[in-house]
Amino acid sequence: MLWFKNLMVYRLSRDVSLRAEEMEKQLASMAFTPCGSQDMAKMGWVAPMGSHSDALTHVANGQIVICARKEEKILPSPVIKQALEAKIAKLEAEQARKLKKTEKDSLKDEVLHSLLPRAFSRFSQTMMWIDTVNGLIMVDCASAKKAEDTLALLRKSLGSLPVVPLTLENPIELTLTEWVRSGSAAQGFQLLDEAELKSLLEDGGVIRAKKQDLTSEEITNHIEAGKVVTKLALDWQQRVQFVMCDDGSLKRLKFCDELRDQNEDIDREDFAQRFDADFILMTGELAALIQNLIEGLGGEAQR
């Protein structure tokens, strides 16, 4: 099981029926296929269990995991520039004149298409967890754009997907700042030794503290000077550590060894059983963590 490393959290904005059997067929219509000779990028669904299963969905206890794969052709700018300049020089020599800008622009497209079949590919995979019990969707990535791209693929596959980023009643940075100022987080959470503080002024500074006592006078002085905490490393019940960000995302999730070893009694050769057990364990822990976090940060904004 690929334990999630990051969480971008989204709320289903209205009740929708997300049944795995139906979803399996819908995702199959947009299953991943590699780039053709003239494709810059392709994105589609693959089995979350990799070569161990053909199923595009994996379901347990009302939780669904799916996986998107993206292939991107890599064409470094210097390579394009060099090929374009050579082509322009050749044509200008043959025609004994300088090419116009419009001619050069169309040549760039030609060069791009001629290079594409020989370009290397970069592959990436993004896991998505759909919590049908709590009406949430979590994407395992660190960037909002990547999460939105994956959600867009799901929306296209399903026909519609009414989701919005999870929004809290109070600004997250103000709550995090208060936790650091008081030296105490919400119940179940503990401050660790890492934070980022930003000035509210447009051209103000950014302070990144690592391996530092966040209750120290130095940090307090930054807060008193008007900086707010935009990232804060936290521990939840000595089970999961993570960095809480002011955009509502959780980065660098780290599950304690005791938790990760809980399914060690399952034979590693039985990949499907281990994957299923780890998925149930991870989603159970993270669902509880998210609920605690929403409450600790002052509750979800009214919709």
Curated annotation (Swiss-Prot):
It is found in: Cytoplasm, Nucleoid. The lineage of its organism: Bacteria, Pseudomonadati, Pseudomonadota, Gammaproteobacteria, Enterobacterales. PANTHER family: RECOMBINATION-ASSOCIATED PROTEIN RDGC. One of its GO terms (cellular component) is cytoplasm. Its main location: cytoplasm. Pfam families: RdgC (PF04381). Keywords: Cytoplasm, DNA recombination. This is Recombination-associated protein RdgC. May be involved in recombination. InterPro entries: RdgC. It comes from Escherichia fergusonii (strain ATCC 35469 / DSM 13698 / CCUG 18766 / IAM 14443 / JCM 21226 / LMG 7866 / NBRC 102419 / NCTC 12128 / CDC 0568-73). It comes from the Bacteria. Belongs to the RdgC family. GO terms for molecular function: double-stranded DNA binding. GO terms for biological process: DNA recombination; regulation of DNA recombination.
